[in-house]
Amino acid sequence: MASDGHLAAPLLDGGGGVDDAALLRRLYVGHFLARWGARMWEFSVGLYMIRIWPGSLLLTAVYGVVEASAVAALGPIVGAVVDRLAYLQVLRLWLLLQGASFVAAGVSVTALLVYGARLAAAGFPAFVALVVVTNVSGALAALSTLAGTILIEREWVVVIAGGQPAAVLTGINSVIRRIDLSCKLLAPVLSGFFISFVSMEASAAALAAWNLAAVWVQYWLFVSVYAGFPALSETSQISRRRADDDEAAAAAQPQKVERLWMTMLPCWESWAVYARQEVVLPGVALAFLYFTVLSFGTLMTATLDWEGIPAYVISLARGVSAAVGIAATWVYPAAHARVSTLRAGLWSIWAQWCCLLVCVASVWAGGAAPLASAWMLMGGVAASRLGLWMFDLAVMQLMQDGVPESDRCVVGGVQNSLQSMFDLLTYVMGIIVSDPRDFGELIVLSFFLVTCAAAMYTMHVYRVRKHLFHLDRILPKMNWIKAS
């Protein structure tokens, strides 16, 4: 393998470092396969549930609550498990559990789609059992996907880019996020095509078959990356020894009441570690952005449909929104090179805030021109994706750089748990404010939370840099303008 010093070349100018570039491509392909299966299921499960229980969003809402609750409650534990196990152990556990969960969910959904009506009429317990299997399998798939995300995005990427210029880590992060957003854009298109022109039952069976076949390819790709970068095995061994030492030290200490209480609450220690980090404010600010209806999710899509916007228009707007998000993965490296990670995040979050002003204006435009209001809402949300995903990349890199290696997995688990908690609150608010005519209230609430997130991040920037603007550069320019 080429030396690590050549790693920056393929990311920055496309030359040299052929072996490292090939290994990175394997990492990207493996990540693509994992995200593609997850995004297909994420899009399709709502359609499956509506078909199984026509005329009601009950099963869809219950599934969303179960999945979000599982990640919110168990996310810190997943992070702690990833931190304690060797990289290959986590890899095997992730891929095995994710593949088995998606296969089980696909099989149970297929059975519900084919036999659901008969089961509900003849044997309701069997119907409920299949729904429970689908929900539990989906929750397990989400937890295993979280483990894989922490392993690849929080650990492997940082280790691979270790000792390289900051632009290398920025480049890898951007490609990883670009893959995720591309899957978010294209996987629903393929799934929708399959459902519309073949059948929903066939799409569920194909989803199970895809995950069964893809898991072996993913394993081979990731193992080859692990073997190709010696730093990964070295870091894994160091982390494992540190975990063993911590266990031995804990066993040698007397079992005080406080330690027993901490054992009963395994998440508490993870949250305490998270709260001690220097980057806790950016992390909480990012989590606030998940408590929102200002995205092409279930609530906003349903409201647009209620307002009479055709489904194909909504899907095109969603595609434009995803394309803007993908563009953010190209813009962010350039912005990072000019203004640093911290300032790139500051400009990004306030750019998102400015775009969402159009969405707030749509609330007051709705009474006089409902169609124009809907277009303003879609346009504002789509434009805001540039700032949103640039901010996401900035916070992710701040955490990669600012969190100690020993805490990285735990912090990643808590961060995802916190984001899922706010995502869950969005579902709760949708239940409380369920009338589409009151959707404007949810828009204003979402905008308020984005404002809070921007304020928190601005406080962090001021705390670190001791200033927000270079007044020594701005004032001379103002004096020059006044003099002219």
Curated annotation (Swiss-Prot):
GO CC terms, sorted: membrane
Record's keyword terms, sorted: Ion transport, Membrane, Transmembrane, Transmembrane helix, Transport
Membrane protein topology class: Multi-pass membrane protein
BP term (GO), one: iron ion transport
Record Pfam families: FPN1
Main location per the UniProt record: membrane
Cell compartments where the protein resides: Membrane
Any one GO molecular function term: iron ion transmembrane transporter activity
Transmembrane residue ranges: 58-78, 94-114, 123-143, 189-209, 212-232, 279-299, 308-328, 346-366, 377-397, 413-433, 442-462
Function: May be involved in iron transport and iron homeostasis.
UniProt record similarity statement: Belongs to the ferroportin (FP) (TC 2.A.100) family. SLC40A subfamily.
Annotated protein name in UniProt: Solute carrier family 40 member 1
